[in-house]
Amino acid sequence: MVEMTRLDIAQGDFWLCLEQRLAWEGVADETVVATVREILKAIRCRGDEALLEYTQRFDGLEIARAPELEIPTSRLQAALTAISREQREALQVAAERITTYHRHQKQESWSYTEPDGTLLGQQVRPLDRVGLYVPGGKAAYPSSVLMNALPAKVAGVSELIMVVPTPKGEMNDLVLGAAAIAGVDRVFTVGGAQAVAALAFGTESVPRVDKIVGPGNMYVATAKSMVFGQVGIDMIAGPSEILVLCDGKTDPEWIAMDLFSQAEHDEAAQAILLSPDGVFLDKVTEAMARLLPTLERQEVIANSLRSRGTLIKVENLDQALEVINFIAPEHLELSVEDPQALASRVRHAGAIFMGRYTAEAIGDYCAGSNHVLPTSRTARFSSPLGVYDFQKRSSLIQCSPQGSQTLGRVASVLARGEGLTAHARSAEYRLKG
């Protein structure tokens, strides 16, 4: 038996009920905040000494000297050799596709020259150094390494520093192998808020970075939010989400498994199915009941579906689009006859998976698009991680002698209107006559 809340857009309190289902408290509790604040202060003040202490305390890693925290590149290559041929080839295929996709995103510098010779433009440059946080231990997320590292490499980032916790020295060869394929420059066996602090402030051994990307637990997310402003960050991600719109003509078992694919992340993950066909909603529910016992993470999935999973009945696809754009889902599947036409009407979604044969899991691993996506309705104003996140822009302005006369007079008038005399005179000193 699968328990999921069922809503109908025709019910009077539909939008209120939907908002309640979407609500998620993403703020860390006071204990977490206090702990993270203490860790950040210690790393900032005592550097490697504090980093070693926290690594020994939280990861049980007995290392006497901080330089031993760095994993040599030879170990990354050894990990790549140690994994199975099938895994190695899968990582390489995924890496090639991710690189190809992200090359299309790369922004270039541009400029134009006005008739009087004044030049205006924009110079695009990569960040110097980026830090990548990767969960470690028994969890293996090589896909996160590829998705975060490869766009940075395409952007031209000079140095990519990866941090990954290795509890009791346990290293994951898939993760290290992915780092080798992605061209990560340096890897350190540190994790948690202390790793974020080391990247943000720098220590004697860990270099300070310009931006920190990558997923992590509540302590990592809280640390990232606290150091933001001193360094850039990608985003503070919430639980994983999927919204599937189906017209009722796709195999119910396919849809059931698509919903499971996100619900298995954790109990806070959210899976929503939207359909104008009420009978189809019943069929998917029946399929989930059959398939759930076959899955290793069935308890996590069941809890996720019970707490946040939702089945929504709409009258037509126009109503479905209204709901989709309200939810602004992280992952959106359009399992309908003409998905491209429908996709053009979607205003808010992290990634749109079009057609009956496009499982969301393909995007998680190897389609080529990035799986780091805005969650918790932030797709209303945010975008997937991309090359542009690892580039920055500088404005270019060069006035010709003639241009300085025309623009100088305009600047003078506006500056004096604001009461900024030095601004005005700076422009006026270049005026002739």
UniProtKB/Swiss-Prot annotation:
Textual note on the cofactor: Binds 1 zinc ion per subunit.
Pfam families, per database record: Histidinol_dh
Keywords: Amino-acid biosynthesis, Histidine biosynthesis, Metal-binding, NAD, Oxidoreductase, Zinc
Domain of life: Bacteria
Binding sites annotated in the UniProt record for Zn(2+): 262, 265, 364, 423
GO cellular component terms listed in the entry, alphabetical order: cytosol
UniProt entry tagged with the keyword Oxidoreductase: yes
Residues reported to bind NAD(+): 133, 194, 217
Source species: Nitrosococcus oceani (strain ATCC 19707 / BCRC 17464 / JCM 30415 / NCIMB 11848 / C-107)
GO biological process, one term: L-histidine biosynthetic process
PROSITE patterns associated with the record: HISOL_DEHYDROGENASE (PS00611)
Entry EC no(s): 1.1.1.23
Gene that produces this protein: hisD
Cofactor field: Zn(2+)
Protein name: Histidinol dehydrogenase
List of residues binding substrate: 240, 262, 265, 331, 364, 418, 423
Stored CDD domains: Histidinol_dh (cd06572)
Class in the EC hierarchy, top level: oxidoreductase
Homology family: Belongs to the histidinol dehydrogenase family.
Role description: Catalyzes the sequential NAD-dependent oxidations of L-histidinol to L-histidinaldehyde and then to L-histidine.
